[in-house]
């Protein structure tokens, strides 16, 4: 019975660890968006609204590299971009 109880508790901790991982994954997604935004704001990255997309109206994460007619999200700390938004 001890072995069964040990397996059962192990299985339960794996389940709770899996749900922790899911919420950590969501947090990571938010962090990576912030990092992508910082890179775009520094002018070292290419946003999704750059010339590579053919001038689509997305403007990228920060709107820092998009064409003038883009209406993407802009970050409040970005400089030199055309995306008019205030957040990534």
Swiss-Prot record:
Pfam families: Coiled. Residues 1-24 have a biased composition (Low complexity). Residues 56-66 have a biased composition (Gly residues). Residues 1-25, 45-88 are annotated as: Disordered. Belongs to the hssA/B family. PANTHER family: HSSA/B-LIKE PROTEIN 1-RELATED-RELATED, HSSA_B-LIKE PROTEIN 1-RELATED. This is HssA/B-like protein 64. It comes from Dictyostelium discoideum. The gene is hssl64.
